[in-house]
Amino acid sequence: ILASSSNYRQEIFNKLALNYESISPNIDESSLLSEAAEDLVARLALTKAKAAAVILSARAEATSSVVNKSTAHKESYLIVGSDQVAVIDGKIVTKPHNHSNAFKQLRHASGRRVTFLTSLCLYNTYTGSHQLTVVPYTVNFLPLTDAQIENYLMKEQPYD
């Protein structure tokens, strides 16, 4: 089970030819007060996986018959939750959501070092156990002209 409605994450699963179901966890992805970026992505990956588990449990409960209720919660799933943030100069960069914000963010990243933190959580619904990792990688942006930024944004439209 993929605990995400992200087209990007679904594309990865599709490229891997995985047989999966995508469930939108529909959680609040806001950072907590003074929460470090690493802690944020780890918390969100686990929260997404657990939210998907709750959705699956509710679905099983709703579709099971009275006779079958005792087995409704015995199905087991492996749920993948993930999150990613970018960090520039120690500050978390949020999703731009529109062209103007994306342009400002790329202009700010131009010529700078940007660290991307990606979390991955594998949650086992049968045992309630999980494995979680956060992987950082750093990208050194070359200086970008406004025209280069515009061309990229018009082609890719990376707003979500």
Language-model segments: which ranges?
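Accessory recognition modules or surfaces
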Residues: 2, 33-34, 40
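Cofactor-binding loop segments of dinucleotide-utilizing enzymes, especially the Rossmann-like FAD-
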Residues: 5, 25, 125
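Anionic-ligand binding patches
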Residues: 14, 38-60, 64-160
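N-terminal beta1-alpha1 ligand-phosphate binding loop
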Residues: 1-18
